[in-house]
Curated annotation (Swiss-Prot):
Subcellular location: Cytoplasm, Cytoskeleton, Flagellum axoneme
Gene that specifies this protein: rsph6a
GO-annotated cellular components: motile cilium; radial spoke head
Domain of life: Eukaryota
Function text: Functions as part of radial spoke complexes in the axoneme of sperm flagella that play an important part in motility. The triple radial spokes (RS1, RS2 and RS3) are required to modulate beating of the sperm flagellum.
InterPro entries: Radial_spoke
Biased composition (Basic and acidic residues): 497-506
Segments crossing the lipid bilayer: none
Protein name: Radial spoke head protein 6 homolog A
Natural source organism: Xenopus tropicalis
Keywords: Cell projection, Cilium, Cytoplasm, Cytoskeleton, Flagellum
Region of interest called Disordered, as start-end residue ranges on this chain: 180-231, 371-411, 469-526
CDD domains xrefs: DD_CrRSP4-like
Entry keyword annotation includes Iron-sulfur: no
Lineage of producing organism: Eukaryota, Metazoa, Chordata, Craniata, Vertebrata
Binding partners and assembly: Component of sperm axonemal radial spoke complexes.
Length: 526
């Protein structure tokens, strides 16, 4: 007999246990069996010993399932993108938060000093009656954004200028004035510009001394028109913009005459990115932030109006006014009693411009660019000076401040302004609404003694005939023309024959003269 005895038959209970265990050991597509899962689950319960094991049994089982999930390397899973609404709410959340004690301090300061913060809710209500709906929710958010601007900068005046739309985003524009002597950014910008100009001049001089330059071109570019100083002309106000309420306010740089002149020749939709390049013809000298500032200056000069008599020139300023000088300041009239709404709608003579007109030169005050320094005059020749004196430009003159709207030029056959009542059903409480047809999106809403200017549009001027880019300039002469390089024209056959006959006659006459002289000499010898 062998040692390996044949096992006897199993007990029925043990056999059922084996069958049950083999059933639990069956695996699915993931390679995991129920036996292994229950073993791991029971081991975790015994190790953690939660007080409510029955209640957390299902949650622990689900956690084990999720922990075993393995994502294949060949499966691409796109990350979950945050919605635009969530991003916008995250940006605007800071507007509605208030630190401990900040509210009480701001209220106490508001009682002591007047705040430059405008009442935007009142403005939105006034505009809504005039048919320009800014929206109550957006008005609240913009008001909170303006409050943040006034809290972080020493402002004397803050005004909501409007909203410029763009293809990829819009701009909220705030028009501000700093307290006297507290605009440090403007002074720093001016110093940097002066340093840059000095460095450029030094580099040019060094390059000229170091290298033998080829002959200089006789072409002289037009003189650079200087920009107006901060606080005057087109740079009278400072502008801040942000992409949406809650975003950071960005200060726009001062505008230059070259940028205004170029903006008049192009049409470009804003993208919502201040650093985006402006690719147009004619080329624009700057990026979108400069184009935005130029368009704001143009829109303000053409659409900011007020009822006649609301503003007046100062008495002291009128006495000291020099002949030919341009008035650029005014003050509110304390004796203004208001103009009835019906009269504001009937005649445009009851409205005036209270922002200076921008001349074709790109400035509000004309500057003579033909006046040159003594060094430049010494270098130039007398003939060139005489030519320049003959071609001296004529001064540009625009309409003065507080000019009535009735003197505005028409756009083809379209009037520049349209005035109407906000409602004809209840005329006693109606408002006067003035809409600009030259700059679509510019509105002025006025009651008897109160008015508001706002612009909500694409920043494009109306052109009835459509836009066509200007033609390129005429090609310049490659070299100066003169008799030294001018080719003579070939003579005709008749001219050649006449010249030949004239030469033959001259030769015959010369021979006769020689013969006569020879005969006279022979006679004298005899």
């Amino acid at each position: 007999m062998t040692d390996n005895a044949i096992p006897g038959p199993l007990d029925p209970e043990e056999l059922q246990i084996q069958y049950a265990k083999s059933f639990l050991l069956q695996t699915d597509n993931s390679g995991l069996s129920l036996y292994e899962h229950l073993s791991a689950l029971l081991s975790r319960i015994l190790s953690e010993r939660p007080p409510n094991a029955l209640e957390v049994f299902e949650s622990l089982s689900a956690e084990l399932h999720w922990s075993r999930l393995k994502q294949g390397s060949d499966v691409l899973r796109a990350p979950r993108e945050e919605s635009h609404t969530c991003r916008k709410a995250e940006v605007q959340r800071a507007l509605f938060s208030r630190g401990d004690g900040e509210g009480e301090e701001s209220e106490a300061e508001g009682e002591m000093t007047e705040s430059p913060l405008p009442n935007l809710l009142d403005l939105a209500h006034l505009l809504q009656q005039g048919g320009v709906n800014l929206g109550r929710d957006e008005a609240v958010r913009i008001s909170l954004a303006l409050k943040r601007l006034t809290d972080t900068h020493p402002l004397q005046v803050c005004h909501f200028w409007g909203k410029i739309l763009g293809s990829g985003g819009s701009y909220l524009v705030a028009e501000v004035q700093f307290r006297e002597g507290e605009d440090d950014e403007a002074e720093e910008g001016g110093e940097e510009e002066e340093k840059g100009e000095v460095e450029d001049d030094v580099e040019e001089e060094e390059n000229e001394e170091a290298e033998d330059l080829p002959p200089k071109s006789t072409y002289r570019p037009p003189p650079v028109i200087p920009k107006e100083e901060n606080g005057t002309g087109a740079n009278k106000h400072v502008y801040y913009v942000c992409s949406e309420a809650g975003a950071e306010w960005v200060r726009l740089p001062p505008v230059t005459p070259a940028q205004i002149s170029a903006a008049r020749k192009i049409r470009h939709l804003f993208t919502g990115n201040l650093d985006a390049p402006v690719i147009t013809y004619p080329p624009f000298p700057g990026t979108e932030i400069n184009l935005l500032r130029a368009q704001i200056a143009r829109i303000s000069a053409g659409t900011h109006v007020s009822p006649l008599g609301y503003y007046q020139f100062g008495e002291e300023e009128g006495e000291e006014e020099e002949e030919g000088a341009v008035r650029d300041t005014y003050e509110e009239n304390p004796d203004f009693e208001g103009i009835p709404v019906s009269e504001l709608v009937e005649s445009l003579s009851n409205w005036v411009h209270h922002v200076q007109h921008i001349l074709p030169q790109g400035r509000c005050v004309w500057v003579n660019t033909s006046v040159k320094s003594e060094e430049e005059e010494d270098e130039e020749e007398a003939e060139e000076e005489e030519k320049e004196e003959e071609n001296e430009p004529e001064p540009e003159v625009g309409p003065p401040l507080l000019t009535p709207l009735s003197e505005d030029a028409e756009i083809g056959q379209t009037p520049p302004w349209t005035a109407f009542l906000s409602t004809h059903l209840i005329p006693h409480y109606a408002l006067a609404v003035l809409r600009s047809n030259l700059w679509p999106g510019a509105y002025t809403v006025s009651s008897a003694k109160k008015f508001e200017n706002i612009y909500i549009g694409w920043g494009l001027k109306y052109m009835p005939e459509g836009y066509s880019p200007p033609a390129p300039p005429a090609p310049q002469a490659e070299y100066p023309s003169g008799p030294e390089i001018t080719e003579s024209t070939d003579p005709t056959v008749e001219e050649e024959q006449a010249l030949k006959a004239a030469k033959e006659e001259a030769e015959a006459a010369a021979e006769e003269m020689e013969e006569e002289e020879d005969e006279e000499e022979e006679e004298e010898d005899d």
